[in-house]
Amino acid sequence: MARILNIEIPSNKRVVISLTYILGIGKSLSKEIIVKANEKLAKAKEKTFTEDSRVKDLSEEQLQAIRDSAKTYLTEGDLRREVSLNIKRLMEIKCYRGIRHRKGLPVRGQVTQKNARTRKGPRKTVAGKKGK
């Protein structure tokens, strides 16, 4: 297993797929990283690789080029911290989205009269009136 951005990525998979094991890197960003790494390798007159190459077949120079290209993006812990700080900021300024976060309700305008059980949690039963 190769180590990129302190994450062990699977060696037997294609490079494009392996990079998606890192939080914050999807398929399109993975392809972008590979293009940048290949440009860097071409400048240094090293052997380039394709998206279909397996991680286990890459040389140390190629892996280092991928590491350097991936460093420029916000990933893993830094990304988690950024997202949590954004949510905290919304709650502090008491905007509509922040209030929805604080109350544990859907934030993006979904209807909540009958649905949104995942966000609201299990039903809280209310006792009916006794002795009509």
From Swiss-Prot:
User: Pfam families from the xrefs?
Assistant: Ribosomal_S13
Q: Where is the composition biased (Basic residues)?
A: 116-132
One annotated GO biological process: translation
Q: Which PROSITE patterns match?
A: RIBOSOMAL_S13_1, RIBOSOMAL_S13_2
Q: PANTHER family in the record, alphabetically?
A: 30S RIBOSOMAL PROTEIN S13/40S RIBOSOMAL PROTEIN S18 (PTHR10871), SMALL RIBOSOMAL SUBUNIT PROTEIN US13M (PTHR10871:SF1)
Q: Which family does it belong to?
A: Belongs to the universal ribosomal protein uS13 family.
Which HAMAP family did the record assign?
A: Ribosomal_uS13
Q: What name does this protein carry?
A: Small ribosomal subunit protein uS13
**Which organism does this sequence originate in?**
Mycoplasmopsis pulmonis (strain UAB CTIP)
- Coding gene? rpsM
